[in-house]
Amino acid sequence: MYIKSIVLEGFKSYAQRTEIRDFDPLFNAITGLNGSGKSNILDSICFLLGISNLSQVRASSLQDLVYKNGQAGVNKATVSITFDNSDKKNSPLGFENNDEITITRQVIVGGRNKYLINGMNASNNRVQDLFGSVGLNVNNPHFLIMQGQITKVLNMKPTEILAMIEEAAGTRMYECKKITAHKTIEKKESKLDEIRRIITEEISPTLEKLKEARASYLEYQKMTREVENLRRIYVAFQYVRAEEIKDRSTNALKEAQANKKKIFESMAENEKKVKELAQQIEETEKKNNEEFGAKLHSLEAAFSELQRVDAKVRSDLDHRKQNLNSEENRLKELIKIMQEEFKAFTSKEKEIKKIKEGLNGLQEESKKDAEALASAQQHFNAVSAGLSSNDSGQGTSLADQMMTCKNEISKAATEAKQAQMKLKYAQQELKTKQAEVKKMDGSYKEDQEAFEAIRKTKEKLQDEMKKLKYEEAEQEAHLAKKKQLSSEISSLRELCESIEAKHPYLRFEYKNPEKNWNPNCVKGLVVTLITVKDISTSKALEAVAGGKLYNIVVDTEATGKKILEKGQLKHRYTIIPLSKISANSIGHEIISLAKNLIGHREVHIAISLIDYNSELQKAMEYVFGTTLVCSSMDNAKKVTFDKRIMRKTVTLQGDIFDPQGTLSGGASSHVTPILSKLKTMRDAEDELKIKTSQLEATEKELANLKNMAEKYQHLKQQWEMKSEEAELLQTKIQQSAYHKQQEDLLALKKTIAECEETLKKTEESQRKAEEEYKALENKMKNAEAERGKEIKNAQQKLNSAKKKADDSSRKMKEKQQEVEALVLELEQLKQEQASYKQQSEAAQQAIASLKEQVSALEAEAVKTRESLKNAENELSSEKGLMEERTKDIKAKSAKIEKYREQNNELQLSINALEHDINKYQQETADASSTLDKLLKEYKWIASEKELFGQADTTYDFEANNPKETGQKLQKLLTKKEKLEKSLNMRAMNLLSEAEERYNDLMKKKRMVENDKIKILATIEELDRKKNKALHIAWEKVNKDFGSIFSMLLPGAKAMLVPSKKQNILDGLEFRVGLGDIWKENLTELSGGQRSLAALSLILAILLFKPAPIYILDEVDAALDLSHTQNIGQMLHAHFKQSQFLVVSLKDGMFNNANVLYRTKFVDGISTVSRHCQLKKKQPLSEASNNKDE
């Protein structure tokens, strides 16, 4: 198949219809100036072949292919190529019967394009398959060698060169298909994995569940039959038992009514007798009152008055005693405070004394520094006046100073002599005393050792006392704290109890309805389960909740039922079960509307104003979730009657607005809201817990301190005893003769030390005076020089003395201020001490006065008790006289009491009989009702009741124990009811459908898995064939590559070798030999040699599996004329079965072509002219033949 003609219209530079006809089947060349449209002819062929990479035809979009992008009146580009298909062996698939194939491709501005094959519309894929079947795959166009293609081949990696061989061998398409197949297998595998997962996680569990459901359904049917059988037996027994109860109750009722009538008659008789006796007693009492009544009344009045006076006196006495105890406690407190204040006062005095001592020291130091300053000033003045200063700083002449030194030397010598004499006497006296002391030191040593032992024992006891770390004041502090905490706890308890006593309905009490009852099931009253965030909203929240505030919250309706039936509740309550309760709570949209209407802070949903446990959410929504709370009546009115909201609202004052038109409110109550009181009680309870824990900790501390205090007191007692012993021994030691001798010895030793010190001082004074005398002599000799030096020294001493005097003065003033401040504090303490003293004196006076009052009241109480006792005796005596007169009344009263007791007993009997009558009536009615109900509910009773209780029948109650039957029936009904909740009635049908789907899915899964195995086996077989074909292609291409290269570059050789491990599947590389030298790398060749090598490889690949058409676009651009000539000859020699279209500008190339087409650019449009060159070449051929001959 080869190109016969090309028709271009509106394509790139070919604006008008241009037909290029009579293409040579072998070698065609196209030439022309640059820009004349040579390459556009090749582009048109690529365009028709269906190229997808438009950059290869030098366009960015299909519109670029239209002449001037459709701007010159041409709005479409058409390319039509006629192919010769006379070679049926190489014909495209499906076109074996066509001698010519005309293919047209047209693109219209806007991107629309279409294909036509022999005038019929065709799809892009059909055209691609047509060309692909004859080796013209335009999207991998190895038949198309464009400008730059050679350079691209030179830069190819080994794997890319291998890809070219694969494409030539036809295995590349297989590789693409294999990759696609592997991807498809992977996708299918992931789908299979998904199917396996669905089978494992969804379908299999579903099947298991359905099987279980089927088993449950079968069991349910069996259970239903058994329940029906047991129910018949049990109902029959109930019917028989109801008839028996009815008969028995009717007979018992008649008997009870007869007994009641008899008892009523006996009671009437007793009442008659009681009336007669009461009339007799009344007459007797009337007589007695006339005789004793007035006096007895007078005595009773006097006795009552004395009782009142006695109570008042005792009350006053108790009050005075309490006041006395209070004053005495107050006095103790004052005395304790005064003692503490006195300690502080004493401590402050000691501190002032200590600071004053420091101040005195500073004052003396300041005085000395001031005197030193005056002395330094005087010395400076004297030196400045020409005098020299002595040691005292006074200005004197050198002669006077020398005289003074002589006097001091003489004085020191005299004092030394006196001290020497005194020392000698003291030393002799010391020896004598020491000899006497040795004779009497035995008993003294014993006393001294005993004293030392006691002192050590005292120190040991003191250390042990310190280790205890016990402070006597600590226990008192803890006791005071305990007392305070006890008082506070008592107050808090009273507060809580008083609130609970005033509001008993805050307590919810019930009896556990069953054993092992879980109290957590009952949450409690709503009012006790919430906490108000802001007290100011309490009244509003109470209005919102209303009666629901005292509803009981429980976990389930079953819990509520048990409490109501068996909890023995003392009041009526409404139960809120969390499992059932629901409320139409106000949505966020409504709340937002209300807030936008009157302001965000002016309205809130009631539930947002309380805190509660999250598990109570439903109950709180039921009570507080349907009402809004507004700040005022105006706001509440706006919100309630707004057509978008229309919800119930409550104001902070408790006024209620209902959207139905009702308004509740009015005068506000001054009573504190219960929620506020409840918060107060909760706060008090929290504080009570804290105080109670603190009290326990304090008591624990006191218990610990008690043991420690006992140890401390024991050690302290021992220490005091040892202190007394030590004092006695010390007194004895001090009064002994040995001690006096020791004191004399110490005095002598002191005298000897003083004398030795005096000797040292006199020697030092004498030495200094002699040195000073010598210095003065030197000064006399150097008077002028010494004077300047003395002035300088005097100035330095003056400056130093001045600085020191200033410092000491400043320190003294600071200390004075500190003393003044402490004196003021001390004065304050004195005033407080005086105040406490006055208070204690007043308290003592009050105590004395109260004691007198108590004594007086005690005396008065004794008198009133005596008067009361006398009045009581007199009253008893009078009553005794009256009682003797009333013995007859008592006897009659006893009879009345007896008759009344009889009537009470008879009344109890009547009550019991009435209870029995009601019971029998109820039993009869219940039995009748049961019989009617059973007959109505079970129609079969009427026909089968004759068999009830009969032996050897279904209703044989001896064979079938009714009690056991009832229990068994109840268990089966419970089990059946439980089973019904989870029972799937469609399980049988669903299971069949599910099993059918499961089997179908498993069958499809196995088919897919088998197909996968077959595909993988086929791929493996094709891989082997591909490798074989690839080796054949490589060998053939390698051979042709060497042959073509040798022809293009005589004397040179070339080959393709595997890049790694002699395995061509890893890639192929160039090897070029020039003469006998093989080059390892193409970089060692010249540019022309490299181009020829690349071109040789391309042509060798083309030669392996020749395509019908080859297109070469200026491949000779980088070659010289000789190489170009060789290319033309090589094409004639090697490619005799394919059509070549070559674009070239060199004569050496296109002179070898059979047909030459020349392009020109005329008036902005490309034109083509055809030139046949066979005639030119013929003479050359003939000449060649003649020459050979």
Swiss-Prot record:
It comes from the Eukaryota. Residues 522-639 form the SMC hinge domain. GO terms for biological process: cell division; mitotic chromosome condensation. It is found in: Nucleus; Cytoplasm; Chromosome. Keywords: ATP-binding, Cell cycle, Cell division, Chromosome, Coiled coil, Cytoplasm, DNA condensation, Mitosis, Nucleotide-binding, Nucleus. ATP binds at residues 32-39. Belongs to the SMC family. SMC2 subfamily. PANTHER family: STRUCTURAL MAINTENANCE OF CHROMOSOMES PROTEIN 3. Central component of the condensin complex, a complex required for conversion of interphase chromatin into mitotic-like condense chromosomes. The condensin complex probably introduces positive supercoils into relaxed DNA in the presence of type I topoisomerases and converts nicked DNA into positive knotted forms in the presence of type II topoisomerases. The flexible SMC hinge domain, which separates the large intramolecular coiled coil regions, allows the heterodimerization with SMC4, forming a V-shaped heterodimer. This is Structural maintenance of chromosomes protein 2. It comes from Gallus gallus. The lineage of its organism: Eukaryota, Metazoa, Chordata, Craniata, Vertebrata. The gene is SMC2.
